[in-house]
From Swiss-Prot:
Gene3D superfamilies named in the record: Aspartate Aminotransferase, domain 1, Type I PLP-dependent aspartate aminotransferase-like (Major domain)
InterPro entries to which the protein is assigned, alphabetical: Aminotrans_V_dom, Aminotrans_V_PyrdxlP_BS, Pser_aminoTfrase, PyrdxlP-dep_Trfase, PyrdxlP-dep_Trfase_major, PyrdxlP-dep_Trfase_small
One Gene Ontology term from the biological process aspect of the record: pyridoxine biosynthetic process
Pathway membership: Amino-acid biosynthesis; L-serine biosynthesis; L-serine from 3-phospho-D-glycerate: step 2/3; Cofactor biosynthesis; pyridoxine 5'-phosphate biosynthesis; pyridoxine 5'-phosphate from D-erythrose 4-phosphate: step 3/5
GO-annotated molecular function: O-phospho-L-serine:2-oxoglutarate aminotransferase activity; protein homodimerization activity; pyridoxal phosphate binding
CC terms in the record's Gene Ontology section: cytoplasm; cytosol
Protein name: Phosphoserine aminotransferase
Residues reported in the UniProt entry to bind pyridoxal 5'-phosphate: 76-77, 102, 153, 174, 197, 239-240
Catalytic reactions on record: O-phospho-L-serine + 2-oxoglutarate = 3-phosphooxypyruvate + L-glutamate; 4-(phosphooxy)-L-threonine + 2-oxoglutarate = (R)-3-hydroxy-2-oxo-4-phosphooxybutanoate + L-glutamate
Subcellular location: Cytoplasm
Length: 362
């Protein structure tokens, strides 16, 4: 079978080694003669899976001991509600920084529970889309927290700065598309959340990192399944968790540790991004309209000079084993999502195709 490289923005490509192990264990996991999907989440065998997954995740991100790690349902959109419901306390407003589609979606959801103070960080510099630096973000004095999205998958925009707003500012961040792709200082955040389907594992699992002093503040109307304290008190098993996604994510964590951890992923991701953006920048046939300082290393949108060629590009790239390159319906064009599981050879195959396509159609 020919090598297939999946550039989907999520659910995304998983490491080949992880898929192979899951395949081998599918019908007889841990010598039990059953699948991991069939065992009780409260049985000792799965409890071991859960504990190892949390330990490995903590190791990968150097999560401080005063932070809790929760394995949840609901995805990023669930957390758009969970964050205000858990963190507002007796306050009625929170700061939200709008830098793209997902930040705006979080703001829309937050309006159900509080009055967001919205700071529009989007700017245009020399015709390119960019984000104002953090030093220019205008925060209010009475906000319960500040929320932002470090990587916008649709816009192809990244905010790589580390928050430094002082100890009194609780920072909440949607790391769904950039978690584990680069080192982060967890101690600078109050809440970090991430849907699993991009850099962690399959869809269905959401991971939350929350500073323990923020627990116990949930609104009385907060659904129990979104209440951080209840989830923490029940070991993330208040109800039946997505066990297969949890198991597969645990395999991904072990794969990451065996391959140099987050520091090594950071280096490889930089190489992949430089290779792809290099082909785009050295061409009049392809274009990316994001300022270099804010370009995403995870999601690279680009347009062809002649949009009439889009359909042919997608057909020929798919035939070449380069899948899921169609851009989001909001922006059109193409998008290559190059998360941790995408090997350098996959990006090389894409850039080789792009160069050849331009030669024939440019």
């Amino acid at each position: 079978m020919a090598q297939i490289f999946n550039f989907s923005s999520g659910p995304a490509m998983l490491p080949a080694e992880v898929l192979k192990q899951a395949q081998q264990e599918l019908r007889d996991w841990n010598g039990l003669g059953t699948s991991v999907m069939e065992v009780s989440h409260r049985g000792k065998e799965f409890i071991q899976v859960a504990e190892e997954a949390e330990k490995d995740f903590r190791d990968l991100l150097n999560v401080p001991s005063n932070y809790k790690v929760l394995f949840c349902h609901g995805g990023g959109r669930g957390q758009f509600a969970a964050v205000p419901l858990n963190i507002l306390g007796d306050k009625t407003t929170a700061d939200y920084v709008d830098a793209g589609y997902w930040a705006a979606s979080a703001i829309k959801e937050a309006k159900k529970y509080c009055t967001p103070n919205v700071f529009d960080a989007k700017v245009t510099v020399d015709g390119l889309r960019a984000v104002k630096p953090m030093r220019e973000w205008q925060l209010s004095d009475n906000a319960a927290y500040m929320h932002y999205c470090p990587n916008e998958t649709i816009d192809g925009i990244a905010i790589d700065e580390t928050p430094d707003f002082g100890a009194d500012v609780v920072v909440a961040a949607d790391f769904s598309s950039t978690i584990l792709s680069r080192p982060i200082d967890v101690s600078r955040y109050g809440v970090i959340y991430a849907g699993a389907q991009k850099n962690i594992g399959p869809a269905g699992l959401t991971i939350v990192i929350v500073r323990e002093d923020l627990l116990g503040k949930a609104n009385i109307a907060c659904p129990s399944i979104l209440d951080y304290s209840i989830l923490n008190d029940n070991g993330s098993m208040f109800n039946t968790p997505p066990t297969f996604a949890w198991y597969l994510s645990g395999l991904v964590f072990k794969w990451l540790k065996a391959n140099g951890g987050v520091a090594e992923m950071d280096k490889i991701n930089q190489q992949k991004a430089e290779l792809l953006y290099g082909v785009i920048d050295n061409s009049d046939f392809y274009r990316n309209d994001v300022a270099k300082a804010n370009r995403s290393r995870m999601n690279v949108p680009f347009q062809l000079a002649d949009s009439a060629l889009d359909k042919l590009f997608l057909e020929e790239s798919f035939a070449a084993g380069l899948h899921a390159l169609k851009g989001h319906r909001v922006v059109g064009g193409m998008r290559a999502s190059i998360y941790n599981a995408m090997p350098l050879e996959g990006v090389k195959a894409l850039t080789d195709f792009m160069v050849e396509f331009e030669r024939r159609h440019g």
